């Protein structure tokens, strides 16, 4: 019996955010695609300068939202900081939570913080 789209959607709905991030990464590798949104073409670069793909990202907490305690817990879990330091980051938003993270780590951290109720940007 083949899986239907509805079966797949229900299975994904039951997964944790980290499992979904891993699933997306596996699908990107398997099918050679990217889940990133298409970006409009910018001005052409000089022929002698090769465009470099960004490999390091900063995860910035822009707002804690209504569930501040959950966001503090998520920051502590992701960074290993103590309660006081994590609370200072959350209270001082916008603040950088993690610098020079890989694309996958940044996406996973963003997902975890958003699940906790925070607003997050990746730069």
From Swiss-Prot:
The protein's assembly and partners: Homodimer. Part of the ribosomal stalk of the 50S ribosomal subunit. Forms a multimeric L10(L12)X complex, where L10 forms an elongated spine to which 2 to 4 L12 dimers bind in a sequential fashion. Binds GTP-bound translation factors.
One GO-annotated biological process of the protein:
translation
Stretches that traverse the bilayer: none
In the record, the note on similarity to other proteins reads: Belongs to the bacterial ribosomal protein bL12 family.
Put simply, this protein is called: Large ribosomal subunit protein bL12
Q: Which GO terms describe its molecular function?
A: mRNA binding; structural constituent of ribosome
Entry keyword set? Ribonucleoprotein, Ribosomal protein
Role description: Forms part of the ribosomal stalk which helps the ribosome interact with GTP-bound translation factors. Is thus essential for accurate translation.
GO CC term (a single one): cytosolic large ribosomal subunit
UniProt-listed Gene3D superfamilies: 3.30.1390.10, Single helix bin
Database matches in SUPFAM superfamilies: ClpS-like, Ribosomal protein L7/12, oligomerisation (N-terminal) domain
**InterPro entries given in the database record:** Ribosomal_bL12, Ribosomal_bL12_C, Ribosomal_bL12_C/ClpS-like, Ribosomal_bL12_oligo, Ribosomal_bL12_oligo_N_sf
């Amino acid at each position: 019996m083949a899986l239907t789209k509805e079966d797949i959607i229900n299975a994904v709905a039951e997964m944790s955010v980290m499992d979904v991030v891993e699933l997306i990464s596996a699908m990107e590798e398997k099918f050679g695609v990217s889940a990133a949104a298409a970006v409009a073409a910018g001005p052409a670069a000089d022929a002698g300068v090769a465009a470099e793909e960004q490999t390091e990202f900063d995860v910035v907490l822009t707002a804690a939202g209504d569930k501040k305690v959950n966001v503090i817990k998520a920051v502590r879990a992701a960074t290993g900081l103590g309660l006081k330091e994590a609370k200072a980051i959350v209270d001082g938003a916008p603040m950088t939570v993690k610098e020079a993270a890989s694309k996958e780590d940044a996406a996973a951290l963003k997902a975890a913080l958003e699940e906790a109720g925070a607003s997050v940007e990746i730069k």
